[in-house]
Amino acid sequence: MGIRISHLRKQFASFTALDDITLDVRQGELLALLGPSGSGKTTLLRIMAGLEHADGGQVLFGDEDATRMSVQSRRVGFVFQHYALFKHMDVFENIAFGLRVRRGKERWAEARIRARVEELLALVQLQGLEQRYPTQLSGGQRQRVALARALAIEPRVLLLDEPFGALDAQVRRDLRRWLRELHEQTGLTTVFVTHDQEEALELADRVAILNRGRIEQLDTPARVYDTPASPFVYSFVGAVNRIPGVLAHGQIQVAGHALPSANPALAAGPVEVYVRPEDLVPDADGWPATVAWAQRSGARLRVRAILDAAGNEVEVELPASAGTITAGQQLRLAARHYGVFPA
């Protein structure tokens, strides 16, 4: 089932959390809401879940208007950053909780509940741990229990609020791969919030970049990284160098060299060229630069250099096979891919 968000607005006193947000989440896709603190990503997720209500706009689940629908009626699975597991219940009962609290015709028979929990234990790879309590589990295992509990009610949509935020780096990486595989198995429409760029780019089918209550870009991970729609997206997703220039007659004068404009709609005048460290490469016809600092980092060589003509400091990332580079060494650098925006 898809989700359609239309002209959503949310205000907290004088703070605008969401400013006319419109967004379609496709059926079966895994969508990341990525942005800094205060960008509105968690507020948007909570409104989807029914935990907050918008001041204006509409939320549709499929063709059904869910804007004022209760949390229970929406049938969403929600996973919190800090698990929210019941400490006095073992793994089995935590997973079964949402099924046991149902009333009337919606209440399942005990045999069906048990079968569903056992199915989920296998799905999240926790067979044999059903009698353990949350305090006896690792952080990664607790998050799997939380996810199984969210899936137990057979939700129409799965929503995750920074699901790996409380875990250490290696566990996060392992769980990211596992969650992607799980999504492929279930095909459930899933939206997750994160401030971790790597997490969003690795996991999601599409990424919505939020900033100050607005969506700056909604696109595939590859296009978000390779073709950012704004200076904010360039700066927030990955590292970037900003080099001042002047656009005139379709050419950008940058550090004594001319570059073709990458944006034909851009008006003449001062501009900034945005280029990622890995897109600055040695080139005999490039900008003269002086190395200020160089450091090997695994398979990469990180270099900080000064463009001689402009005096701008830039960061360069080269393969370690580029050889030894030392401070004071002269280089020539060219931008193989870049974006241009008004200064």
UniProtKB/Swiss-Prot annotation:
It is a peripheral membrane protein. Belongs to the ABC transporter superfamily. Sulfate/tungstate importer (TC 3.A.1.6) family. PANTHER family: SPERMIDINE/PUTRESCINE IMPORT ATP-BINDING PROTEIN POTA, SPERMIDINE_PUTRESCINE IMPORT ATP-BINDING PROTEIN POTA. It catalyses: sulfate(out) + ATP + H2O = sulfate(in) + ADP + phosphate + H(+); thiosulfate(out) + ATP + H2O = thiosulfate(in) + ADP + phosphate + H(+). The complex is composed of two ATP-binding proteins (CysA), two transmembrane proteins (CysT and CysW) and a solute-binding protein (CysP). Residues 3-237 form the ABC transporter domain. Signal peptide: none annotated. Part of the ABC transporter complex CysAWTP involved in sulfate/thiosulfate import. Responsible for energy coupling to the transport system. InterPro entries: AAA+_ATPase, ABC_SmlMolc_Importer, ABC_transporter-like_ATP-bd, ABC_transporter-like_CS, Mo/tungstate-bd_C_term_dom, P-loop_NTPase, Sulph_transpt1, TOBE-like. Its main location: membrane. NCBIfam families: 3a0106s01. ATP binds at G35, P36, S37, G38, S39, G40, K41, T42. This is Sulfate/thiosulfate import ATP-binding protein CysA. Gene3D superfamilies: P-loop containing nucleotide triphosphate hydrolases. GO terms for molecular function: ABC-type sulfate transporter activity; ABC-type thiosulfate transporter activity; ATP binding; ATP hydrolysis activity. Keywords: ATP-binding, Cell inner membrane, Cell membrane, Membrane, Nucleotide-binding, Sulfate transport, Translocase, Transport. One of its GO terms (cellular component) is ATP-binding cassette (ABC) transporter complex. One of its GO terms (biological process) is sulfate transmembrane transport. Its EC number is 7.3.2.3. The keyword Cell inner membrane applies.
